[in-house]
Structures are given as C-alpha cells and as structure tokens.
Amino acid sequence: MKSHAAVAAELLGDEAMVTAVLADVESSPLDDAHKALFRFIDRVNHESPSITEADLERVRSAGWSDEALYFAITVCALFNFYNRWIDASGVHALSDEAHRHGGKRSAQYGYVRT
C-alpha cells in the first residue's frame, strides 16, 4: 500500500475497503455515488482532453456538487504531479510499513511536516 492509500486506510479505519477499491472499483463495496466519482477521476487520469459536459453531468446526477468535483479534480491533479515528481527525482521507494507509518501521521496531522 502506497502513501495516499495508506492515508485513506487510516482515515477510513478500513484497509480492506481501500484494497478492494484499488483492485476494482466496480466490484468494491463503495456506494454508487462514490463509484461514479471514481469512474470520473479515472477519466481525469487517463482521458482528460476528452472529458465533456456529459461526463460532468453523470457525476452531478450521482449527487456530487461542482465544489466536490473541483476538489476531486484538484486532488487528482496534485497527486499526479507529486507522483511524477517523485518518480523523476530519484527519491527511493519506501516500504509498505513506512507508507503505513506515514499514512497514520498524515491522517492525524495532515500533509504537513511533523
């Protein structure tokens, strides 16, 4: 489990849920609204130039506000930035245990240096 997943597992108190979502959103125990959001974010990750108003309407019709979409897109974009920066900078990979420890710290204190 990597850093952002470890934070999500810590905040949810449910590592099995995070593992299930990462394995396959559609068969995970997420509710339909969250599955719709994850489908949309997957498109942001892989097909952002082809996103249309119809894509946004599908997520809105699942119950998400424009503000929620703004934050979801922003978090997605920031995570992509950080992941690419780390990949390209030669920062060494951390162990799963180090990610879990960092996840607990980030869940408790936020994404700040402690």
Place the predicted regions along the sequence by residue.
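Hydrophobic alpha-helical segments
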Residues: 1-114
